[in-house]
Amino acid sequence: MLCKKCMKELTTFNTYPSDRRYCIACGTEHSTYISERRKTLTSLREMNLESKIIQTKYLIRCAVIEFGLDKVYISYSGGKDSTVLSHIAKSMYPDILHLFANTTNEYPETIQHIKWEKEENGTNIITVLPIDAKGDTWTFKKVVETYGYPMFSKRVANAIRTYQHALSERTKQNSQDYLDRNFKKYEKYKELPISDKCCDKLKKEPLRRKAKQLGLECAILGILASESYQREKDWLEYGCNVFHERKDNQSRPLSFWNDKDILEYIERYDVKIPKLYDMGYSRNGCMYCGFGVHL
């Protein structure tokens, strides 16, 4: 295995103990960088709502300047976070394109809201269905039967799937060690049909194909770093706007917002969100998703 940064071969003696992707020198440098990034994220989170709106508009504008208005799109879920993002983006670019991935596992209230946005609120939305490159339609049932059920969290489900599908004994043992270190309490579920592939098959892959088909180059997402460990980690590594660094160009201009900011914005600007939230739900997501059941 090679150091992620300097590509030096990693051994028992030169591997950084807290992050085994790095040698000691690079790991120490990276740790310092992440520590400074964490301070930056804290400062951004402490800003008032008006300042956050200004910063969010700046980040959206950067994406449009970098790629062109006809090459960017709002990845729209119909939830309150992406609806706030849409409201801000449309105040700048009224006709900005929205792509909505209908996973076939949506709440009826979400579908109703999408219909309202398109037909009554004038939002430029294209609905994307989960059809793969071969033209086959995927459903939640098909994903579960083929790969397994989405349970606990994406990290846990991914760890279990990696363990189950290891191609060598060494990989299987490494996966077992990873489960032991990070998810000991879920080890008893490691032989059950659990996977993190659901979102890939029903949402991410169809959106990527549609974006490529339309010649789009950058997704603007309404995700918050506070929503999960992985999203915060991702922000610490890359920040809000990630251009020309990874497989997909992304702008995540709400990353430093929190749920309180979202609710305050909705109230201040009288933003319409799905009736789902009036029924006691805190998120929209997919109806039968098992991520979060451990919380």
Language-model features: where?
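The −1 position to Zn-ligating cysteines in a subset of zinc-ribbon hairpins
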Residues: 2, 22, 285-288
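Zinc-coordinating Cys/His ligand positions in small cysteine/histidine-rich zinc-finger domains
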Residues: 3, 11, 23-26
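Cys/His-coordinated zinc-binding microdomains
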Residues: 7, 27, 290
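Short linker/helix segments within small regulatory modules
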Residues: 12-21, 278-281
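ATP-dependent adenylation/nucleotidyltransferase module used to activate substrates
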Residues: 36-268
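Mid-to-C-terminal catalytic subdomains of enzymes
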Residues: 255-295
